Amino acid sequence: MKKITFLSLFIATTFFCQTNTEVHVFDIIKTEKGYDLKNGINISNNAGYDSQPYFYDDNNVLFASTRNKNTDIIIYNLKTNTKRFISDTPNGGEFSPQRIPKSNDISAVRLDDDGLQRFYQYDFKSEINKEIIPDLKVAYPSWFDKNTMIAVAIVHDSLELFLCDLKKKTNFSIAKNIGRSVHRIPNTNLMSFISKENKDSWLLKSLNPENKEIKTITSLKLQEDVTWLPNETLLISRDNYIYKFDPEKDKTPSLFFSSADDNINNISRIAVNSDGTKLALVAEVSPEYLAQEQFEGYNKRNINAFLKPYAKDVKVYRFPNNLEYEGLENMRTRYEGFFKNTADLHCELIKRIVHKNQVIDHELVTANGKTRKAVAIYTTENGKIVSVTFM
């Protein structure tokens, strides 16, 4: 039981940290100067975690999406703008969906509520699912061919890269201290992965699965998420930007995409379809969205809706920096009774200022027959409100 408990905490905090994110898809337009991303749409539109996009084909996108407090797999059709769940796991959830080569089936990591983690193949037609690679706790898979997988797996308290032969049922350890981003390099027989052996500067490396040869491609500093265009140009996400880098031509990365959308913040996962015409990205919702979510929960006196956008270790200050209390449960204790016992509670928003990851609300608060002015400063990180300062 100690191992299960530790592993569950490790997975929850390291691999599947469920922030409030959305999946967006753009058209990639080639121009004389390079590329433009146009016609962006939010294909998830869901409160909670939506992430890990993968192009099933050029017109369908798989991704993991939260519903009923669990995470299932959605497939979104870009032609019809429709989506449907293709998994339904009441006592757990699925992550890291991918299409299995030369098959209509998909693979996904299944994480049960009790901490049990397995890697499954899902058959669309028969709805029969079977476990594959039972000897590894696969976290981030990437298919090389239908019989070969490069898998990032959990070993003790870190991530390790394995070359898995499904026919021979062998798993060969390749490297330790690995990042989550593993991809096939277009037009080659190579896979790329991120080595985190150097804590100050992570390296993007290539692996030849046939002879296990490893070479360094470039330094990524401390960037976690990458993908490839069909012409072997590397894309790297960082903050609200995506950068491009041609390992054969470029000395340094250059700007590929800069978001002007307030609802695209801290871009993480990125994926490109096979013909290079579509790009999917995962981004956090805007700080204003989080402030508005708790604002509406407050006026409804709904304690769960009010607390939802707050981080577990949220800190509450009195201006300028006097800590009053911290922790979500402390916040629940303070507000739950207040909501129940204050029938006339209402907050009116007078003015809102949004600056980077902060929201400043000027409010009129009515409670117990009295109305007063208030100012609240909300600071957000990783899709959650991490601190509130009252003036």
Where are the model-predicted features located?
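Short, aromatic-enriched amphipathic alpha-helices that serve as compact interaction elements
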Residues: 286-302, 309
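Short beta-strand segments enriched in hydrophobic/aromatic residues
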Residues: 65, 110, 283, 310, ...
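A beta-strand edge to alpha-helix "cap/lid" segment located at domain peripheries
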Residues: 332-391
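Sequence signature of WD/YWTD-type beta-propeller architectures
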Residues: 18-289
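A solvent-exposed, acidic/Ser-Thr-rich amphipathic alpha-helical stretch
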Residues: 303-352
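Bacterial Sec-dependent N-terminal signal peptides
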Residues: 1-20
